[in-house]
Amino acid sequence: MKRASIVREKKYYELVEQLKDRTQDVTFSATKALSLLMLFSRYLVNYTNVESVNDINEECAKHYFNYLMKNHKRLGINLTDIKRSMHLISGLLDVDVNHYLKDFSLSNVTLWMTQER
């Protein structure tokens, strides 16, 4: 393995552990919560310069949720998983994501118009 891959893998496991340590009681299965945290950690390692959980801000979370919406088919997740991920990450990081992704109703034109592009 190349050194960069080893460093990214190490950072990935550190982020997963930091996020798991902050996890409180969830209303869905712990296995699902862990898989959502692992997906978030993979995103952070591959697409951001975040070194620890303390570096994650609202802008990073918004970009992640947009990434989920654009790539949900490739990632094999559905809208329920995305909504769970939003609640989980918002709760873990004390990040408030007030934008159109919180509303999954059919009347949310902004959400569904961005998916058609």
Swiss-Prot record:
**UniProt GO cellular component terms:** cytoplasm
InterPro entries for the chain: SwrA
Keywords tagged on the record = Cytoplasm
Is Glycosyltransferase found in the keyword set?
no
Subcellular localization is given as:
Cytoplasm
Task: Please provide the Gene Ontology terms (biological process) for this protein.
Answer: positive regulation of single-species biofilm formation
For whether the record's keyword set contains Cytoplasm, the answer is: yes
Q: Give the miscellaneous note.
A: This protein is functional in undomesticated strains of B.subtilis but not in laboratory strains, such as 168, because of a frameshift mutation. Therefore laboratory strains of B.subtilis are unable to swarm. The frameshift in strain 168 is caused by a single insertion of an adenine in the codon for Tyr-12 which leads to the premature truncation of the protein in residue 13. In addition, the C-terminal section of swrAA was predicted to be an ORF (yvzD) by the genome project.
Q: What does this protein do?
A: Required for swarm cell differentiation. Plays a crucial role in regulating the degree of cell flagellation.
Q: What is this protein called?
A: Swarming motility protein SwrAA
Gene source species: Bacillus subtilis (strain 168)
Give the encoding gene's name. swrAA
